[in-house]
């Protein structure tokens, strides 16, 4: 019984380590691509501002999440978790609205839940939240939210 538990724990630890590496690489790349695209389109001025403004907001979220991934302290943890929750909410809202009002939403990073970016804008914050709430990550960031104890019972 203990060996199976240890095997599962080791497999999960490997997954969590891999997820952290993926996030550390993918967030800056997505910030660069989304931010560059939004900046070029906004500076050109031949576009509607809402879609590109939303893409710029997404790029800002990605940059903030990257900062939280780099600074492994409680402030970095709370910063990243907050922005990942916001990013998830924005992806779901804008992604849903892009099917109902495609002309208004336009071509944002969150359109159709991030279809233009391989659905990374939808999957990435969920993976990030799973990573940030894993016990190993909480220990790395030296975070022990009291409210989290209610979910561990």
Name what the model sees in each region:
Residues 2-153:
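Topology signature of small-to-medium multi-pass alpha-helical membrane proteins
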